[in-house]
Amino acid sequence: MKRAFSSQLRSAYPASKSTHFGRVMASSGSEAKANYAPISTNEPVVSVDWLHSNLGDADIKVLDASWYMAHEQRNPIQEYQVAHIPGALFFDLNGIADRKTNLRHMLPSEEAFAAGCSALGIENNDGVVVYDGMGLFSAARVWWMFRVFGHDKVWVLDGGLPKWRASGYDVESSVSNDAILKASAATEAIEKIYQGQTISPITFQTKFRPHLVLALDQVKENIEDKTYQHIDARSKARFDGIAPEPWKGLPSGHIPGSKCVPFPLMFDSSQTLLPAEELKKQFEQEDISLDSPIAASCGTGVTACILALGLYRLGKTNVAIYDGSWTEWATAPNLPIVGSSS
């Protein structure tokens, strides 16, 4: 995977002039003035208009975190090379991941995440804006990852690359040498950490928040203890066990006691996050209490983070994600499955 990633990056189009993250200036008559506006960490998303106005700020790092299901037959790295927001770097969801499991894109260790972010040139003082090519999909996973490791200055670009382009904003069709090297180095840094090597310099320090992550044993205990409400972001058909999972050999169905809240309920037709009142109605309709603890899962830990994003807008900032999600649960021996199609 590492070699393929590096080689694909190096086959990019000829490098364009790199974007400098300086203070953005907006023209007003014959004078120019700063157009920077601070972002609130109370909100999980920023608009494309906000990002466009502040794209040149040195303290803002923009990440393309596109990832697609296998059946979509889309290559996020190649798509990044063809068109991305100016100055954005590529965050490889499969590359910046745990190497000690066969499960897909699981949360890496603190040391590995710090090494990967440092290789990308991210520092703790930076505000991070994450987007993807779907609109509101895998970017939410990376938003959650940064928060797990103690970085609150992170936001998802509402509507993602599709809304950016629909708004008439420019994209780059080539990457600078610096961007290629950083993207490749991030994956290589992760590999080295898991091989026991030391990486330096480390510019990004982590502070792990265990309450935002659930392990299999905790999910198993919750079936009896009912400490939190467990919501599942997959489709109702997969949840009920009447439609197949996208992964070959994996039965559908759900974890006992969990409730289905399909992730598309969180956004509108343009894949922008719904207003708070509409989000609240969606959870109320599924009999989810906002006054009690909530944890979320999905197929592989990606779309569960979209539910966490919506709940964050409602003030639920401590929603835990079951990282292994359905893939881990359904393949583990002797665990109960409700409505299995197997």
Swiss-Prot record:
It is an enzyme of class 2 (transferase). CDD domains: TST_Repeat_1, TST_Repeat_2. Expressed in roots, rosette and cauline leaves, stems, flowers and siliques. It comes from Arabidopsis thaliana. Residues 56-173, 224-338 form the Rhodanese domain. The lineage of its organism: Eukaryota, Viridiplantae, Streptophyta, Embryophyta, Tracheophyta. One of its GO terms (molecular function) is thiosulfate-cyanide sulfurtransferase activity. The active site is at C298 (cysteine persulfide intermediate). Catalyzes the transfer of a sulfur ion from a donor to cyanide or to other thiol compounds. Substrate preference is 3-mercaptopyruvate > thiosulfate. Involved in embryo and seed development. Pfam families: Rhodanese (PF00581). Its main location: cytoplasm. The keyword Endoplasmic reticulum does not apply. It is found in: Cytoplasm. It catalyses: thiosulfate + hydrogen cyanide = thiocyanate + sulfite + 2 H(+); 2-oxo-3-sulfanylpropanoate + [thioredoxin]-dithiol = [thioredoxin]-disulfide + hydrogen sulfide + pyruvate + H(+). Disruption phenotype: No visible phenotype under normal growth conditions. This is Thiosulfate/3-mercaptopyruvate sulfurtransferase 2. It comes from the Eukaryota. Its EC number is 2.8.1.1, 2.8.1.2.
